Design a protein with these regions (language model features):
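Gly/Ser/Thr-rich phosphate-binding loop
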Residues: 7-62, 73
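Glycine-rich beta-strand-to-loop/alpha-helix junction loops that act as flexible
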Residues: 21-24, 45, 84-86, 134-136
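Short beta-strand-to-turn element immediately C-terminal to the catalytic PLP-Schiff-base lysine
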Residues: 54-58, 77, 84, 175
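AMP-binding/adenylate-forming catalytic core of the ANL superfamily
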Residues: 85, 113-198
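AMP-binding/adenylate-forming catalytic domain of the ANL superfamily
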Residues: 194-208
Length: 208
């Protein structure tokens, strides 16, 4: 999504007709701007181990990434996304030995947290990104998705900082568009996030 944002914001001449987006939350504003310039946007979920795309759909503003493509299977085990496919990497090559990717039934545990509803996969975040603040679990990706839904936010990252009282507290690092002006995101999220999810500091991502 970041590279497409920059193409559109800089008014760069493009001949794109369609683009597959992934790797981060996809703001509706981004796909709408792209559509106005004749670019169809698709969102997907994939891994290198599976020769990339596992699920895909045309972007429609909904949180899911679509259904499994032919030859791919998705299941949820203890909140974790497991995958199985007709074609995938044989394993990881380490120290002259091939280590298999999958369990005895052929399933690969991705360490991604997700849910499946009506056959469509929605990603919640990485299992190992979850942190706790005052005993409450915070999934950074969930907070990031909310922040990037603001029309003047290009991308956002939530990182935990250590805190003596709470254990950890969330901090937001945000990239704004050129028309952002003076936005008070701390005020904007007050009725959209639980108190424990609200960042205690807001930092601006430095320009490249």
């Amino acid at each position: 999504p970041t590279q497409l944002w920059r193409l559109l914001v800089n008014n760069a001449p493009v001949s794109l007709k369609a683009v597959l987006l992934g790797g981060a939350a996809i703001p509706v504003e981004l796909t709408e701007q792209a559509r106005e310039q004749g670019i169809r946007c698709w969102c997907g979920y994939g891994l290198t181990e599976f020769a990339s795309t596992v699920c895909a759909k045309e972007a429609d503003g909904k949180a899911d990434v679509g259904s499994a493509l032919p030859g791919r299977e998705v299941r949820i085990v203890d909140d974790e996304v497991w995958l199985r496919a007709a074609s995938m990497a044989q394993g990881y090559w380490r120290n002259g030995q091939l280590y298999p990717l999958v369990n005895a039934q052929g399933w690969f545990a991705t360490r991604d947290r997700g849910i499946v509803h009506d056959g469509k996969l929605t990603l919640v975040g990485r299992m190992d990104n979850l942190f706790f603040s005052g005993g409450e679990g915070i999934q950074p990706e969930e907070v990031e998705r909310l922040i990037v839904s603001h029309p003047h936010v290009l991308q956002a990252f939530i990182v935990p900082i250590e805190d003596e009282e709470f254990g950890h507290r969330p901090v937001a690092v945000v990239e704004y568009d050129a028309e952002a002006g003076s936005i008070d995101l701390a005020e904007w999220v007050k009725d959209k996030l639980a108190r424990f999810q609200q960042p205690v500091r807001w930092l601006t991502l430095p320009a490249e």
